[in-house]
């Protein structure tokens, strides 16, 4: 089987598995883990949009750090939600996750430390505290069947 055919087959298998999953925590975790695997990513975070228009950390995974919080782990995530709007009501365009949620666009940053477009100070603080070095960041909005962004 050719690589493109294998990837297409895998996406179909993932889609079938996701449509069959009834447990929301397992479903969200599977989405994140499959996205990490498809993107060959070391880490990933799933945010859920709240009624207050914030993005709540729902699941965090980082293979190098052995970090697994949220989802089915039972490990609480003690990080405040990301604001989608600033205090003055303007869109929070400096945070990549809120920008993706507000615009509905997928964003791919080659190096978070070289980006002038977005504020990665939270990422850098995490890196300093753990000894990790975040490199590329792929941010993908998650839409429901009505095409509303429900997470990132």
Give the location of each predicted region:
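Short, hydrophobic-rich beta-strand element in sensory/regulatory alpha-beta domains
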Residues: 33-36, 42-49, 53-58, 97-98, ...
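GAF sensory/regulatory domain recognition
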Residues: 45-91, 114-115
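Signal-transmission linkers at sensory-effector interfaces
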Residues: 1-30, 37-38, 59, 150
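A short, aliphatic-rich beta-strand micro-motif
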Residues: 135-144
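Signal-transducing coupling segments at domain and membrane junctions
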Residues: 92-98, 105-106, 110-136
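Amphipathic alpha-helical regulatory segments at dimerization interfaces
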Residues: 17-20, 29-38, 98-99, 103, ...
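Residue-level signature of the cytosolic catalytic core of signaling kinases
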Residues: 20, 24, 89-92, 130
């Amino acid at each position: 089987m050719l690589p493109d055919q294998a990837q297409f087959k895998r996406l179909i298998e993932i889609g079938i598995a996701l449509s069959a999953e009834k447990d929301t925590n397992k479903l969200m975790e599977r989405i994140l883990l499959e996205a990490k695997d498809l993107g060959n990513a070391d880490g990933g975070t799933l945010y859920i949009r709240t009624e207050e228009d914030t993005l709540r950390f729902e699941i965090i995974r980082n293979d190098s750090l052995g970090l697994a919080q949220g989802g089915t782990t039972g490990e609480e995530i003690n990080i405040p939600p990301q604001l989608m709007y600033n205090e003055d009501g303007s869109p929070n365009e400096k945070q990549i996750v809120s920008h993706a949620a507000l615009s509905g666009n997928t964003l791919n940053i080659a190096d978070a430390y070289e980006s002038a477009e977005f504020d990665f100070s939270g990422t850098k603080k995490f890196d300093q505290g753990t000894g990790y070095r975040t490199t590329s960041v792929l941010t993908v909005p998650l839409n429901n069947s009505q095409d509303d962004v429900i997470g990132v």
